[in-house]
Amino acid sequence: MARITVEDCLEVVNNRFELVMMASKRARQLANGVPPLIENNSEDKPTVLALREIAARKINSKMIDEIEKAERERTEREAMEWAAAEVVADEDISKSDD
């Protein structure tokens, strides 16, 4: 596949600074296991894959923010479930000590 350039992405995102923010957020999501929206036949690194998605108009800042919010909510929910399980385990240990 042809090399991706900043100019390719600037056709989609008008501001270089916004492009950097979008690409870095999306690359972080991809690195954390969020599935890509385009095929990754060449096993590109998350940063390159993020830029390819932006250039292909498969992702925008609103979508990135929604994915980020969903991931944050999932992480918080898992933390709450873990904390609740710890409380139950602590209560069980306290009861067995009596």
Swiss-Prot record:
Instruction: Look at the named UniProt entry and state the broad enzyme category this protein falls under.
Output: transferase
Query: Sorted alphabetically, which keywords does the UniProt record give?
Result: DNA-directed RNA polymerase, Nucleotidyltransferase, Transcription, Transferase
Biological process GO terms, please? DNA-templated transcription
Question: What one GO molecular function would you report for this record?
Answer: DNA-directed RNA polymerase activity
Enzyme Commission number(s) = 2.7.7.6
InterPro entries for this protein: DNA-dir_RNA_pol_omega (IPR003716), Pol_omega/Rpo6/RPB6 (IPR006110), RPB6/omega-like_sf (IPR036161)
This entry carries the following GO cellular component terms, namely: DNA-directed RNA polymerase complex
Q: Which domain of life is it from?
A: Bacteria
Please write the reaction equations for the catalytic activity of this protein: RNA(n) + a ribonucleoside 5'-triphosphate = RNA(n+1) + diphosphate
Give the family per the record.
Answer: Belongs to the RNA polymerase subunit omega family.
Q: How does this chain assemble? A: The RNAP catalytic core consists of 2 alpha, 1 beta, 1 beta' and 1 omega subunit. When a sigma factor is associated with the core the holoenzyme is formed, which can initiate transcription.
Q: What does this protein do?
A: Promotes RNA polymerase assembly. Latches the N- and C-terminal regions of the beta' subunit thereby facilitating its interaction with the beta and alpha subunits.
Database matches in HAMAP family: RNApol_bact_RpoZ
NCBIfam families, sorted: rpoZ (TIGR00690)
Which PANTHER family does the record match to this protein?
A: DNA-DIRECTED RNA POLYMERASE SUBUNIT OMEGA
Name under which the protein is recorded: DNA-directed RNA polymerase subunit omega
Lineage runs: Bacteria, Pseudomonadati, Pseudomonadota, Gammaproteobacteria, Lysobacterales
Q: Report which gene this protein is encoded by.
A: rpoZ
